[in-house]
């Protein structure tokens, strides 16, 4: 038995989908444990590019089981669209399993998300997908789960009760039109019936696989710095992308987690508002954004760009228990005369090495950089660190030293062949 968790160790968009897809080759089960359709991942399979939001990357392998765990908030409409998209492109989905305990995103969640964000003076940068309101209902114990969605009478009763309260908020607080009960019930009950064949107790599926000695890969969404507890609160998501979220969001005990792979870029990116100490506002930032095609998979918003921040990565290592790193997008830095790594912050005249919780302190933090010479050589063909130009080797090795975690995979381009194994996590 072996289990590996793939987590984003920055602010999301680190290339987790590609790494998960790469590690899926030796996995028997691939499971999502949190988030919803607010974060997309891009996978290149058989020369074709696929963009998924809910379905795990393992769906492309017919001999593997793909799981949407109980910690995910699920929009049935988005999921049906994604399944149709895969079917239209010749991808079978018989290997998908959906937790009966996952909570369902309904139209009032999306409308409330939009209305709340519009009303705020300070924007969090929501994707308007209803994720936050769905998790709020879950915490308030009024959420509707997949198991409820499949039961005609229970769904009818819960939806009726919820809609009374939601329409009060929508109409009286946000001056929105009320939602129609019959329209929602008919549409979403029908969607639930379309998904019924995929629904099961996924905790049993995953634990049975582990007990049988199979390899299980857990796939997170977003990143550690967007974690509701350990991220840049309140500019965070509504769930726990950290590795600890696996136990809650998939129904697997912590003693069954063996490895945690932290995925990161060779620089840093962020979508939406919030602290970003190493952010670049110059031509170098623009160059990295365009070279790296740094635009959101779901939102299409241009991502904010900054230098690699080892303070952030050490924070991710500590709170998520990273055992190895997966370094992506090294090729994007090719051609820069100088590359920088943030090794610490200056705060009120003091050098600090840990990420502050206070937004006031974060705004006052000035990055302390190490400057290293860049490289001009094409590295997209390199298949090991030893094949990299000397300056690129120095950069990679220094990143690992500052973070204190070994690099297990190194990517020098978007294709699978450009992802190089330096250490096999399944045999570690």
Curated annotation (Swiss-Prot):
PROSITE patterns: ADENYLOSUCCIN_SYN_1, ADENYLOSUCCIN_SYN_2
GO BP, sorted A to Z: 'de novo' AMP biosynthetic process; IMP metabolic process
Gene3D superfamilies linked to this entry: Adenylosuccinate Synthetase, subunit A, domain 1, Adenylosuccinate Synthetase, subunit A, domain 2, Adenylosuccinate Synthetase, subunit A, domain 3
GO CC aspect terms: cytoplasm
Enzyme Commission (EC) number: 6.3.4.4
Protein residues bound to substrate: 297-303
Keyword Magnesium set for record: yes
SUPFAM superfamilies linked to this entry: P-loop containing nucleoside triphosphate hydrolases
Cofactor(s) needed for function: Mg(2+)
Pfam families xrefs: Adenylsucc_synt (PF00709)
Quaternary structure note: Homodimer.
Annotated protein name in UniProt: Adenylosuccinate synthetase
Organism: Levilactobacillus brevis (strain ATCC 367 / BCRC 12310 / CIP 105137 / JCM 1170 / LMG 11437 / NCIMB 947 / NCTC 947) (Lactobacillus brevis)
């Amino acid at each position: 038995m072996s289990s590996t968790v793939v987590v984003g160790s920055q602010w999301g968009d680190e290339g987790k989908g590609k790494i998960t897809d790469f590690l899926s080759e030796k996995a028997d089960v691939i499971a999502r444990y949190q988030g919803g359709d607010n974060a997309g991942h891009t996978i290149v399979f058989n020369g074709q590019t696929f963009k998924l939001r809910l379905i795990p990357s393992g769906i492309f392998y017919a001999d593997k089981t793909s799981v949407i765990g109980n910690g995910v908030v699920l929009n049935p409409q988005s999921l049906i669209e994604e399944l149709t998209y895969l079917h239209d492109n010749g991808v079978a989905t018989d290997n998908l399993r959906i937790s009966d305990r996952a909570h369902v995103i309904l139209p009032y969640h999306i409308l409330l998300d939009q209305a709340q964000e519009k009303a705020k003076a300070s924007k969090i940068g929501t994707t308007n997908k209803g994720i936050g309101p769905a998790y709020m209902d879950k915490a308030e114990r009024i959420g509707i789960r997949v198991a409820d969605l499949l039961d005609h009478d229970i769904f009818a009763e819960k939806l009726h009760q919820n809609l009374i309260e939601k329409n009060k908020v929508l109409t009286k607080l946000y001056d929105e039109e009320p939602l129609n009960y019959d329209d929602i019930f008919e549409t979403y009950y029908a969607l639930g019936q379309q998904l019924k064949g995929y629904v099961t107790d996924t905790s049993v599926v995953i634990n049975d696989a582990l007990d049988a000695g199979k390899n299980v890969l857990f796939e997170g969404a977003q990143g550690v710095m967007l974690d509701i507890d350990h991220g840049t609160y309140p500019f965070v998501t509504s769930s726990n992308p950290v590795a600890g979220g696996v136990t809650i969001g998939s129904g697997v005990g912590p003693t069954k987690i063996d490895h945690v792979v932290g995925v990161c870029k060779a620089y840093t990116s962020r979508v939406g508002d919030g602290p970003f100490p190493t952010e670049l506002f110059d031509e170098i930032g623009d160059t990295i954004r365009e070279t790296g095609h740094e635009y959101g998979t779901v939102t299409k918003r241009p991502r904010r760009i900054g230098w690699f921040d080892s303070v952030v990565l050490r924070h991710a290592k500590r709170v998520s228990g990273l055992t190895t790193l997966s370094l992506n997008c090294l090729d994007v830095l090719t051609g820069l005369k100088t590359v920088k790594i943030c090794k610490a912050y200056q705060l009120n005249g003091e050098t600090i090495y840990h990420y502050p919780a206070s937004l006031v302190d974060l705004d006052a933090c000035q990055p302390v950089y190490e400057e290293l010479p860049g490289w001009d050589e094409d590295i997209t063909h390199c298949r090991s660190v030893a094949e990299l130009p000397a300056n690129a080797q120095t950069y990679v090795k220094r990143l690992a030293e500052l973070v204190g975690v070994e690099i297990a995979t190194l990517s020098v381009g978007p294709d699978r062949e450009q992802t190089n194994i330096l250490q096999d996590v399944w045999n570690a």
